[in-house]
């Protein structure tokens, strides 16, 4: 039986918050096992393999297009994945969802069959950029540290405050807005060497990741008649951090965003004060051992304190870091369908 989710919806709340996110040491694992970026000179396969966490490579849905585009700044060809609903017409504006993978993932990681089914039913274009390489963070500030390093000292206190839940539902414990726990130890070896810090990466990797992501989005916008009032952003882990970062930096691009188990240890939550009208959904499993649930709770508390006009926080009992990707796609698509810019 699918575990029930605890959902918090905050509408037109009053309040204020302040604070910034402290640095944290993090062992990040995306939705998938680590996968390296395809070589620029190699042609994209027609049936790519999406990495699956602990289950080996998983075949990408045949409805997904694997494409390449030329990233002129680095003179490289970078892959991206695209699904276009059969309901999309060239002469009619279509909604688009951009989905960002976690660290070690690829452009195919988030192209899950249930997401494709929902995109087909809703008439969406579903776009998954690479973000230049598997660890670019889409421009978001990357957590400092290395594998095996001890957690940062700014752990969330055990006696955390609680986010009040409406309609008599159980309150969800929350870390204070200025606190985000570092991931627990014990995951040494979970990530291949060089995944977090690769000496071959360019020094401006984060900048390149952000630019390449936006370039692909604009490329698809030019090819199709994308509805700028119904363009959405979602991401998992590193991609969740990228989602929150890009939402704050480019609010004019998105009608709503969703972050799944966001590894947003070093994304400044004060930035939410700049986008109080942006609809945001957060999903986090309470058994996540990669990005602790205290991170999601801290962001939920910050959104309540802004106050955000509309946000939704779903904490999944028994949910781990990877399962939240597929388990709440329907809720995310339903949330997006309610909002336009």
Residues of each region from the PLM?
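Bacterial N-terminal signal peptides
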Residues: 18-31
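A domain-start/cap signature at the N-terminus of enzymes
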Residues: 36-96, 155, 165-166, 175-183, ...
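Primarily recognizes the serine-hydrolase "nucleophile elbow" in alpha/beta-hydrolase
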Residues: 110, 221-223, 229-276
């Amino acid at each position: 039986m699918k575990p029930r989710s605890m959902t918090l919806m905050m509408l037109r709340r009053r309040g204020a918050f302040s604070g910034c996110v402290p640095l944290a040491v993090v062992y990040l694992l995306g939705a998938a096992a680590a996968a390296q970026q395809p070589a620029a000179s190699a042609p994209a396969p027609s049936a790519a393999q999406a990495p699956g966490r602990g289950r080996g490579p998983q075949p990408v849905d045949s409805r997904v297009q694997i494409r390449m585009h030329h990233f002129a700044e680095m003179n490289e060809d970078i892959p991206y994945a695209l699904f276009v609903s059969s309901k999309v017409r060239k002469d009619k504006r279509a909604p688009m969802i951009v989905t960002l993978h976690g660290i070690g993932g690829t452009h195919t990681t988030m192209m899950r069959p249930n997401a494709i089914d929902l995109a087909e039913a809703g008439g969406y274009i579903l776009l998954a950029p690479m973000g230049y390489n598997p660890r670019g963070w889409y421009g978001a500030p990357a957590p400092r540290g290395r594998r095996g390093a001890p957690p940062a000292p700014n752990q969330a206190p055990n006696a955390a405050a609680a986010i009040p839940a409406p309609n008599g539902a159980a309150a969800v414990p929350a870390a204070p807005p200025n606190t985000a726990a570092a991931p627990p130890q014990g995951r040494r070896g979970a990530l291949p060497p060089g995944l977090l810090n690769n000496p071959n990466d360019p020094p401006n990797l984060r900048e390149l990741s952000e630019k390449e992501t936006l370039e692909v989005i604009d490329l698809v916008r030019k090819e199709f008649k994308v509805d700028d009032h119904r363009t959405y952003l979602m991401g998992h882990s590193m991609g969740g951090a990228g989602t929150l970062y890009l939402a704050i930096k480019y609010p004019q691009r998105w009608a709503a965003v969703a972050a799944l188990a966001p590894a947003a240890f070093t994304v400044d939550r004060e930035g939410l004060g700049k986008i109080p009208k942006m609809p945001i959904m957060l999903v986090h499993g309470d058994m996540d051992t990669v990005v602790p649930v205290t991170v999601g709770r801290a962001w939920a508390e910050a959104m309540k304190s802004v106050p955000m006009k509309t946000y939704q926080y779903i904490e999944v009992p028994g949910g781990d870091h990877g399962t939240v990707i597929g388990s709440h796609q329907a809720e995310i698509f339903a949330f997006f369908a309610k909002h336009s810019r």
